[in-house]
UniProtKB/Swiss-Prot annotation:
InterPro entries: Formate_THF_ligase, Formate_THF_ligase_CS, P-loop_NTPase. Keywords: ATP-binding, Ligase, Nucleotide-binding, One-carbon metabolism. Pathway: One-carbon metabolism; tetrahydrofolate interconversion. HAMAP family: FTHFS (MF_01543). GO terms for molecular function: ATP binding; formate-tetrahydrofolate ligase activity. Its EC number is 6.3.4.3. It is an enzyme of class 6 (ligase). The keyword S-adenosyl-L-methionine does not apply. This is Formate--tetrahydrofolate ligase.
Length: 559
């Protein structure tokens, strides 16, 4: 089989104006083209759609992933193509890839095989410049903080309390902790600082949760960058940074329109990680999709304990959206991995391991159905090494839980390989809801109680423990009036626990909170657990070493 980049390179793409006009009814005058195959959809035009009825929202999530990944984006694209092939007006709403994983371990995030969004190389690299705009706005605020201190510190900022970090879209562990302002008085006031990856930043979260230009500026102004020496919060608005930062993001918050390999429309916009951020594409893009199409397929990062929980408890809570059905992606190899099989042996048939690994899938299904009231369908994303017996067993066991499951071969077959899944999703959408939609916790709980609710109800933890510094920070956040905000838990994606090696569906484990960060502009509190880092490092053999540029300008090795 051809590689992802070879498949994408051989595709014949429709002009983006044609995709917009024929698939979505958007006139060319409402697009801001970035070449022939990608464009931003004008915000003024999107605002004019406010009275249109909303389509149905399909959330694609997964069981706890294995290191190679289970294909949520690929399934989202394949399902969109399948719905499109069935004559439905469907659109995908996906996250933009970060160049950190592209050049690191995971690789790109534009789908795979014959279920990709294109132009794949553009999307995986600079795309329309959204991440660069976010980084510029973020780092402008960092510069204004240090400049304010250098020129007299009128706000009396306690430099030891500054929490705002610089960012870049690269995995670079050497920049996690740095000292700035060295070299004497002309270079500013020396202080400890650090870098986060763009997709873990508060500004990325603001970008993805904002609903308008006014909302963008308000949220940016609400950012708390640190505290005065008297203990009062200091905001971006206090520094006069909100206007300039909003200007840098004015055009970027317009959703990006591209297409799948089969010509279906896709809005690819925003890209927070789900393990160290809230893991969902932008509200602007999702709401646009719901007004432009009858069916919106969107994905939330990693397993349902991370991306789907945050989709529901953060994105839905703030936007008022509700998923009509969740498609939970499972693979035979992931089930065997959670059933105790080593990575090197996942290609061997093992029905016993498949059955043991179903505990992990079942907990995700139970959480979505019974805790949040979201109907579920299982997509068995089939790999060539899966046997018929293994796939049939997954379908049987899911059915025994009361959840329909469908084999999908969209990676190798494109949209036609996901048509059974699409028909199953359409059927699920026609059935009356059995449970009422609900959040994992109400707003009025304390921050401690909210973390405990996620830990015990979603993760199956027995207790939550707090490092002393984290507990003090939490108390200060509540004292400053932010106790009603939702929580965004940052933890490993590989387990319900904070131990990536604790697979399956563990119970009674301890959730250790190491650090707490206030994201007042985004509107949530980040709770960092275990050993999670908000600036990843590169692996022993980075993907960057396999990517090259041919003499004719062709990009090689991007996946």
């Amino acid at each position: 089989m051809l590689s992802d980049i070879e498949i994408a390179g051989a595709a014949t793409l429709r002009p983006i104006t044609e995709v917009a006009t024929e698939s979505l009814g958007i006139g060319a005058e409402h697009l801001v083209p970035y070449g022939h195959y990608k464009a931003k959809v004008g915000i003024t035009y999107l605002n004019s759609l406010a009275d249109r009825p909303l389509g149905r929202l399909i959330l694609v999530t997964a069981l706890s992933p294995t290191p190679p990944g289970e294909g949520k984006t690929t399934t989202s694209v394949g399902l969109t193509d399948a719905l499109h092939g069935l004559g439905k007006r469907a659109i995908a709403c996906l996250r933009e890839p970060s160049m950190g994983p592209v050049f690191g371990l995971k690789g790109g995030a534009a789908g795979g095989g014959y279920s990709q969004v294109v132009p794949m190389t553009d999307i995986n690299l600079h795309f329309t410049g959204d991440f660069a705009a976010i980084a510029a706005a973020n780092n402008l605020l960092a510069a204004l903080i240090d400049n304010h201190v250098h020129h007299g510190n009128e706000l009396d900022i306690d430099v030891r309390s500054v929490t705002w970090k610089r960012v870049l879209d690269t995995n670079d562990r050497a920049l996690r902790e740095v000292v700035v302002g060295l070299g004497g008085p002309p270079n500013g006031f020396p202080r400890q600082d650090g870098f986060d990856i763009v997709v873990a930043s508060e500004l990325m979260a603001i970008f993805c949760l904002t609903e308008s230009w006014a909302d963008l500026k308000r949220r940016i102004g609400d950012i708390v960058i640190g505290y005065s020496r008297a203990g009062a919060p200091v905001t971006a608005r206090d520094l006069g940074a909100d206007g300039a930062m909003a200007v840098l993001l004015r055009d970027a918050i317009a959703p990006n329109l591209v297409q799948t390999l089969e010509g279906a429309p896709a809005l690819v916009h925003g890209g927070p990680f789900a393990n160290i951020a809230h893991g969902c594409s932008s509200v602007m893009a999702t709401r646009a999709g719901l007004r432009l199409a009858d069916y919106v397929v969107t994905e939330a990062g990693f397993g349902a304990d991370l991306g789907a929980e945050k989709f529901i408890d953060i994105k839905c809570r703030m936007s008022g959206m509700r998923p009509d059905v969740a498609v939970v992606v499972a693979t035979v190899r992931a089930l065997k991995y959670h059933g105790g099989v080593a990575l090197a042996d996942l290609d061997r048939e093992d029905l016993g391991a498949v059955e043991a690994g179903m505990d992990n899938l079942r907990r995700h299904l139970d959480n979505l159905r019974h805790l949040n009231g979201v109907p579920c369908v299982v997509a068995v994303n089939r790999f060539p090494t899966d046997t018929d017996l293994e796939v049939v067993r997954v379908v049987e066991l899911a059915a025994s839980y009361g959840v329909p499951a469908y084999q999908a071969t969209h990676f190798t077959d494109g949209g036609i390989g996901a048509q059974d899944l699409a028909k199953g999703v359409l059927q699920a959408l026609e059935e009356p809801a059995r449970d009422e939609f609900s959040f994992t916790y109400p707003d009025e709980l304390s921050l401690t109680e909210k973390v405990e609710a996620v830990a015990t109800r979603v993760y199956g933890a027995g207790q939550v423990t707090w490092d002393g510094k984290a507990r003090k920070r939490l108390a200060r956040i509540e004292r400053d009036g932010y106790g009603t905000l939702p929580v965004c838990v940052a933890k490993t994606q590989y387990s319900f626990s904070t131990d990536p090696g604790l697979l399956g569906a563990p119970t009674g484990h301890e959730l250790r909170v190491r650090e707490v960060r206030l994201s007042a502009g985004a509107g949530f509190v980040v709770v960092i657990c275990g050993d999670m880092m908000t600036m990843p490092g590169l692996p022993t053999r980075p993907a960057a070493t396999r990517i090259d540029l041919a003499d004719d300008g062709t990009i090689i090795g991007l996946s």
